[in-house]
Each structure stands twice: as C-alpha cells, then as structure tokens.
Amino acid sequence: MKHFDVVVIGGGHAGCEAAATAARMGVQVALITLRKSGLGVMSCNPAIGGLGKGHLVREIDALDGIMGRAADEAGIQFRLLNRKKGPAVQGPRAQADRRLYREAVQRLLAEQPGLTIIEGEVVDLQVNGGRVQGVSLADGTSVGAGRVILTSGTFLNGVIHIGDQRRPGGRMGDDPSQRLAAVLGELSLARGRLKTGTPPRLDGRTIRWAELEMQPGDEDPVVFSFLNRVPKARQIACGITHTNARTHQIVRDNLSRSAMYGGHIEGVGPRYCPSIEDKIVRFADKEEHQVFLEPEGLDDDTVYPNGISTSLPAEVQEAYVRTIAGLEDVRILQPGYAIEYDYFDPRELRPTLEVKALGGLYFAGQINGTTGYEEAAAQGLAAGLNAALSIREREPLHFSRSGSYLGVMIDDLTSRGVTEPYRMFTSRAEFRLSLRADNADQRLTPIGLDLGCVSDARRESFNKKRELLEKGRALLEGSSFTPSQLNELGIQVSQDGMRRTAFAVMAFGEEAASAVARGVEGYGDLPEEIRQQLAKDGLYAQFILRQEEEAAALKRDEAIRIPADFDYAPLSGLSSELKAKLMRARPSTIAQAAQLEGMTPSALTLILARLRRAGRDAAAV
C-alpha cells in the first residue's frame, strides 16, 4: 500500500490549492481526482476575483499559492472593481480563458516537487483509534495517509436539476460521490443541503455583437500575483445586454416549472448570486436586469451569460434567452441547471479546518458551506498548511480576523456556521481598511517565509519591495512641512503653525500625495507601485487607529442589553440580510448579536449608537 503524508480528495480549486500548499511545505502529497484532465476546471463562471474575492486571491498569492499565477496567465480581461471608491474596497477581477486557466493549474501542479496525482474515486476512509489513517478507492486500492483533506465541492450526493428533470451529478458530465457521502454520514456531523446554479452556455457565433454595448478591460490592468506586472494573454471586450418585460413574463409564466419554485429543491441557494427566477420574484419592480456576455476563451466560441442562471426547462430557457437584445437568434450549447449537494456545518471544525470528531481529517471548500472558487481555494490553502504543520508536529496556523480576509472567513465559518452559501465581501471584515488587496504580501508573506512555504523567487521579490517601502516611509517621515509650505504645494491646511510630516499629509488624498512626491527629495524616484502603496498607508493611518479603538470599545460593550422590541429597520447602514436575521433572532445583548452569521463590528457599532441615542432620548423625557 502506498503511503503519503497528506492525501487530498478532489481536484477542484480547494483541492489543487491544498495539495500544492502541503507539498510546498516539504511533505509528500497525493492528490486523488476522478480525472487528471479535470484539474483546474472552472465549473461555473470563467472569472477569478471580484469584491472581497480578489482580496482572497491576493492573500493566496502572498503565501505562494497557485490561483493568482494561473489567473494572470489565463486572464483575458482585467478590471479593478470599485475603482471610484476607497482603495480598501477595490477588488481585482479577471475574466479567464477556461483552457488557459486549466492548463496553467495543471502545469503548476506538475512542476511541484513532492506531489503525486492519482486518478480514482475515494469511497471510504480508513480510521483507527479515532484518527483517519488513509482512504480506499473504488477499484479496491488503498492509500495510506497521515492526514486527509476532503475537498468534495458539489459532489457529495450531488443532484442536477433542469426543470422537473433531475439526475445524479457532481457537475454536468460527472457522477456524484454517493458512497463517500454515506461514510461521512456515519460520523454524526451536522449536515445540510445547499444549491447553486449556472446559466445556459451560448454559441457566440449566433450573437448579434454589433448591436450590443461592449465593455473593454482596464487600460492599466491590475493583475493578481505580486510576481507579475502585466497580463500574459491577449485582452478582449465583453458584451452587455439586458432582460426586458418579455423575458420576465416568460419566466413568471413558467415559475412552477422551475426546479427551485416547483418544489424539487430543498437546498438554499446563494443570496448574492440569484437565479433569473429569484430576480423576477424578489425584484418584481425592476424592469430589466443586466447580463454580461463573457467569452469563455480566445479560441472558444462559447459565451457565458453572467446574470441569468436558471433551473427552468431547456425549452423555456431558449424562449426567454431569445427575448434578450442581441440574443434573438442565439443557439444554446448547454442548458443552465441547478445543482444540490451536501455540506457539513463548519462549526464541526477547528480553526485549522480539522474535523473535531475525527483527528487528521480536514474539510475545505464548498463542503463547508461556502460558494465561489476563491473562497474554496483560500480554505484549501489553510487546510494544506495546517495538515503539513501537523505532520511536522509544528504549531498550527490560526489566521486572525485582523490580519487577513482568510482569517475573517474561517472565523465566520467555524464560530457562526452557515445557513446559506457563504460568500466573501469586504463588509465582513471589521479591519478592512488595513486588509487591502495591495498589501496582502506585507501582511502574509512574512508568515509564509517563517513557515517555509514561499519560493526563493518570491522571497527575493518580497524583500526588495519591503526595502523600497521602508526607504519611502523613512523619506516621508523624515520630511515635514509648515502650513505655508503646504499651501505653496497646493495643499490647503489650517494655518496653525504645526509642522506635518509628508506621511501625515498623505491623509489629504491623491492630490496631496502627488504634491508630496514633488516636495520630498528622492521620493519621486521610487517605483510607482511603491508610492501608491505608501499613499494608501498614509490615507488610512488615522482611520485604522480609530478602528482599533472602536474594536476595543465593542469588547467592553458586549453586555449591553437590546430591548425585545428594538427596531432595526431604520438603521440604513445595515444590510437587508442582517436586518432580517436580527429581527428573526432577536438577540438580547450585543454579545448575542455578535454571534449571528454575517454580523460585523461595524454593524454592531451602528446598533450601539442607536441604543445609546435611545437611552439619551429616554433620559431627556
């Protein structure tokens, strides 16, 4: 029987990242997947990154993960989302060529020393003395393991729904994992059903592109990996169109034939990626919904219509799609479908992602109730690191909420659990001002260097960047200006006679940063990337101090009581999701409110402010 230090089950985004990460830590790893050719497949949308998600990809890359590098090789349109908002919430996103992404992932895995890829289906876990010892394959093969990481995606008891038709499937074209699901059921872990969906795939040759609005990528594309500077593939534009009243009427007339609305699905779907059926029902007053037509590759005529995922019958899909401008003659290559699958309550896990009830077994990805490639890959990285550290008998790595979005996600999952597919947003992070996408390497690469999971090339690149940042910060801190000097530079400040360092002046925004570059000798010679990061550091410096003070104050305020009839509706800063959960749960204290799934310190601060205002009003009567 072959034996490996770590065995990873599943070759999706979580599995690939887990296997590569554990191998970088110097342990022997086996990645078991149904088909080697399926490694790196993008099962749903052909894109990486986005709001919150792009931050996760940067954090994965900072620890030398593979997702960012693969996305840079395959990216055919890069856009920085939220570009008009503050730097902290700007998220890099890339539309990817499916083939190029798959090939990049497979090459990166093949080049990784210590990683063996095995084709097969895992059907059982070998357990002895309360610890997992290995796995059994469908062909009778046994593989020994010191640690096992399960990244099953949507395969556990997966069922594909198209209208009233249902069939077993982990995704279109692949069988589900039923025998392993039965084995996991014997562990008595809390489990549930979730669902996700995908839109029909379109033949781009039958789309009237000339009639559509086209959206190009950014002129100054922001890539994912800190080792790269520019995209590697040819860049293209996407099409934009919209649904209309006819579209909505067809969907409305056939809601009973939808798998979701026809009662065929019990699993809960992702709130922030609704199907076209959900959009028509939940947003009945909207006259149209935007649809992005995303080519799936440079040499592929398939188009992904982002925004119309569905579980309606194939003939209904064809009818409503052809009411959309530019798609009147379109041919559907593959119908959209919903997929329902098992997940396990992530509160059954330690913060290392190890299962509490069975030592040596780790869960990562959609099995933990998350949705999205990026969330899965980040969990895979965390599980791979901790499994390897455990093999080496080293201290586990606990990602903190204050240090990474990865830490926010794992803490949310393991302490609050999920009732619907969990997606990362910047609003989930109370320390988001310091958790920017551009400084992920400064936050996490030092940890990777200490752990030994970072390549020599990344070490060299990181050290060079850190030296430049330190040099730039010293120049800024060592230069100061009087109010008169600042006025001469075009920066209007109070004439209070106080000198201000150049770093402090960064808080006044982009124009001030540009003026400082002209006023500090040697600063303008630094690379643009370094000056941009220092400007963001200065911009947020005072806010971050205040943020830390608020977090400390929240800790002190946990015992404050919330009236049973407290009205959350007027709190405009709360999301509708949080308002609904608060009104349903009716927490009696701030501490109880803090434990709700999706709760954030900023939301707690809003509630506290309203409670204090109500208290002052009552005292004044």
Curated annotation (Swiss-Prot):
Positions with a binding annotation for FAD: G10, G11, G12, H13, A14, G15, V122, S177, Q366
Residues in the signal sequence: none
Gene assigned in the entry: mnmG
Location in the cell: Cytoplasm
Short name of any one Pfam family annotated for the protein: GIDA_C_1st
UniProt xrefs under InterPro entries: FAD/NAD-bd_sf (IPR036188), GIDA_C_N (IPR049312), MnmG (IPR004416), MnmG-rel (IPR002218), MnmG-rel_CS (IPR020595), MnmG_C (IPR026904), MnmG_C_subdom (IPR047001), MnmG_C_subdom_sf (IPR044920)
UniProt xrefs under Gene3D superfamilies: FAD/NAD(P)-binding domain, GidA associated domain, C-terminal subdomain
Subunit text: Homodimer. Heterotetramer of two MnmE and two MnmG subunits.
Chain residues that bind NAD(+): 269-283
Entry's family note: Belongs to the MnmG family.
Disulfide bonds listed in the record: none
Keyword Flavoprotein appears in the UniProt entry: yes
NCBIfam families in alphabetical order: mnmG_gidA (TIGR00136)
UniProt keyword list: Cytoplasm, FAD, Flavoprotein, NAD, tRNA processing
Cofactor(s), names only, from the UniProt record: FAD
Lineage, highest ranks first: Bacteria, Pseudomonadati, Pseudomonadota, Alphaproteobacteria, Rhodobacterales
GO biological process per UniProt: tRNA methylation; tRNA wobble uridine modification
This protein's record includes keyword Flavoprotein: yes
Function per UniProt: NAD-binding protein involved in the addition of a carboxymethylaminomethyl (cmnm) group at the wobble position (U34) of certain tRNAs, forming tRNA-cmnm(5)s(2)U34.
GO molecular function terms noted in the UniProt entry: flavin adenine dinucleotide binding
Protein name: tRNA uridine 5-carboxymethylaminomethyl modification enzyme MnmG
Domain of life of the source: Bacteria
